[in-house]
């Protein structure tokens, strides 16, 4: 008579719960103690706020806990005798797998219930936040556990499982690291955006997520405005990905050869993924170390690191040191040809990425700003960059961009047309720029189709491009870090002049204030008022001008709030109109 297939075995579940009780008990106790470490003497609204702030960071603990749970439950697959003995028992593979998956979920449910139950005792009317805590914890665990089970099916030993778990969790950031270290320097000015790489790394995204729009106020108490849909959607997608990994693990387990127990990987394709990842990681690690030493050593260390990674990776996969065979050497040659070819193709840039400048009619707005400017480019100061929409001013940005693109960013007498080769010379030789100082310029275009283009350039202070930059950043909007200069000028409250060590003068008269602003505007028009120190000589400082004006701050949902905003302007010797006005003022 044909035996009925069972997809679940309750006895195995109970055995797992008792066999690995120390693991889930310790985690449950740790979660309870962690929640008890909060200041429970605070009022319930404050405790609720603390709990909301922990929902994202606690994902790191689920990352490790899920790996430990999967390693314990599926550890029998990594030992030859245990693996063969297990599969000789009258228990179907599907039944054993699904029972272990259910055991893992129980191992997550018990700590979540314990921690949430303890938290609910102190949350009073905010008890429902404990339920949100439990839900987010379980969904985070489902993703990491699903990935860990998938890695367990792909690996033949625990070390291989841990290696693949780490690589897959941080794969996008590892790719970003390799690209920014090896390929980005060959594309002068190009900046690889981290946004999508971070989005594809759940460890980072879950860690920084807030799931509730909840704030605490000492007077109003807890203020709940709703759930943060974007974070919850991302969490649900991750949990869904965890379920997909569990399904893939089930498909792999049905085909898993028992003789692979003890091998580094159980399936050959995963061996290729591990070998390439391991080789690149080790190569870039040594490359980074060599880059610190300089003088041609970075690429030498890269080659050594890749050689070590390739052969030691094969040793792990083959479980032998006898890997110096024709097959392995031919694979190494093919890998190096592909790698060097990709570097050469990046350097040649057949797609014209380096020289790409959007057309004026494609641009919605453009922005250009400097690193280490005296102004604070953030929303708190009311200034989040100078976004230009006027077509003529956008064309000005494009012209400066074109000039910077063809300005050598290293020492020497290379012509602009050879700037890309010159970049490689600088990278290979790690030259010291002949002692020149550099200014970092950021260019950003927001296109009408929603895309954004970023470029970053390191411009020598002595280059011709500095003159154009100095003129551009002498615009009053850049000098005072405001988007509406005329409105700022009309609302000035007071002006204070500082020079020397203790000398100062306050201008109370509207006439004096407007005369000073007229002198500053004249220097802005002349292109000499740029505020970055590299636009002027080392000994050109004359005075500071501290200006306060009435401003309106946009506070989002709280509306607009009136207040006072201040900024200061540095006067240098080449600001001849402002210097002349200050001299006349001091003589009066």
Predicted regions and their residues:
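Function-determining sites in protein domains
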Residues: 325-338, 343-588
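Alpha-helical transmembrane segments of polytopic membrane proteins
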Residues: 54-60, 131-141, 168, 230-240, ...
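Central hydrophobic cores of alpha-helical transmembrane segments
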Residues: 27, 159-172, 306, 326-339
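Cytosolic-side transmembrane helix boundary signature
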Residues: 300-336
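Hydrophobic alpha-helical transmembrane segments
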Residues: 1-80, 245-258, 270, 282-296, ...
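Terminal transmembrane helical anchor/hairpin motif
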Residues: 40-50, 174-266, 284-303, 354-360
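Helix-loop-helix units of permease transmembrane domains in multi-pass membrane transporters
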Residues: 73-106, 509-527
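Secretory targeting signals
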Residues: 39, 52-55, 59, 102-161, ...
């Amino acid at each position: 008579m044909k035996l009925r297939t069972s997809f679940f075995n309750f006895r195995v579940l109970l055995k797992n719960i008792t066999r690995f009780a120390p693991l889930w008990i310790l985690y449950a106790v740790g979660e309870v103690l962690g929640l008890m470490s909060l200041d429970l003497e605070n009022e319930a609204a404050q405790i609720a706020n603390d709990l909301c702030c922990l929902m994202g960071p606690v994902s790191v603990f689920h990352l490790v806990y899920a790996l430990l749970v999967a390693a314990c439950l599926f550890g029998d697959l990594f030992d030859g005798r245990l693996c063969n003995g297990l599969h000789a028992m009258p228990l179907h593979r599907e039944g054993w797998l699904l029972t272990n998956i259910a055991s893992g979920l129980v191992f997550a449910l018990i700590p979540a219930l314990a921690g949430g139950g303890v938290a609910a005792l102190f949350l009073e009317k905010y008890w429902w936040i404990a339920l949100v805590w439990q839900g987010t914890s379980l969904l985070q665990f489902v993703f990491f556990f699903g990935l860990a089970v998938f890695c367990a099916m792909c690996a033949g030993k625990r070390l291989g499982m841990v290696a693949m778990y780490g690589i897959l969790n941080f794969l996008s950031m590892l790719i970003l690291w390799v690209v920014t270290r090896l390929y980005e320097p060959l594309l002068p000015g190009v900046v690889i955006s981290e946004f999508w790489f971070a989005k594809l790394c759940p460890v980072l995204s879950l860690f920084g997520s807030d799931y509730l729009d909840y704030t605490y106020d000492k007077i109003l108490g807890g203020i709940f405005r709703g759930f943060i849909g974007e974070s919850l959607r991302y969490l649900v997608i991750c949990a869904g990905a965890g379920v997909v990994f569990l399904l893939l693990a089930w498909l792999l387990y049905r085909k898993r050869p028992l003789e692979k127990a003890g091998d580094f990987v159980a399936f050959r394709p995963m061996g290729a993924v591990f070998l390439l990842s391991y080789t690149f990681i080790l190569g870039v690690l040594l490359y980074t170390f060599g880059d610190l030493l300089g003088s041609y050593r970075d690429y030498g260390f890269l080659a050594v690191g890749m050689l070590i990674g390739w052969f030691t990776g094969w040793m792990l996969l083959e479980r032998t040191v006898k890997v110096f065979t024709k097959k392995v050497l031919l694979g190494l040659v093919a890998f190096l040809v592909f790698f060097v070819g990709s570097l050469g193709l990046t350097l040649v840039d057949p797609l014209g990425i380096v020289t790409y400048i959007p057309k004026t009619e494609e641009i919605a707005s453009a922005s250009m700003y400097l690193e280490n400017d005296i102004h604070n480019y953030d929303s708190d100061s009311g200034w989040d960059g100078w976004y230009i929409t006027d077509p003529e001013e956008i064309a000005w940005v494009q012209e400066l961009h074109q000039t910077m693109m063809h300005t050598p960013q290293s020492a020497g007498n290379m012509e602009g047309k050879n700037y890309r080769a010159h970049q490689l010379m600088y990278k290979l030789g790690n030259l010291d720029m002949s002692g020149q100082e550099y200014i970092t310029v950021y260019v950003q275009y927001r296109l009408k189709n929603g895309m954004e283009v970023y470029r970053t350039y390191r411009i020598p202070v002595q280059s011709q491009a500095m003159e154009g930059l100095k003129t551009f950043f002498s615009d009053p909007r850049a000098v005072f870090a405001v988007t509406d200069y005329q409105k700022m000028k009309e609302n000035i409250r007071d002006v204070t002049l500082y020079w020397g060590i203790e000398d100062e003068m306050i201008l109370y008269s509207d006439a004096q204030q407007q005369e000073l602003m007229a002198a500053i505007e004249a220097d802005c028009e002349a292109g000499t008022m740029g505020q970055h120190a590299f636009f002027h000589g080392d000994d050109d400082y004359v005075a500071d001008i501290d200006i306060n004006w009435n401003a309106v701050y946009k506070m989002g949902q709280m509306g607009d709030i009136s207040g006072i905003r201040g900024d200061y302007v540095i006067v240098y010797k080449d600001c001849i109109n402002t210097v002349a006005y200050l001299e006349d003022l001091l003589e009066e």
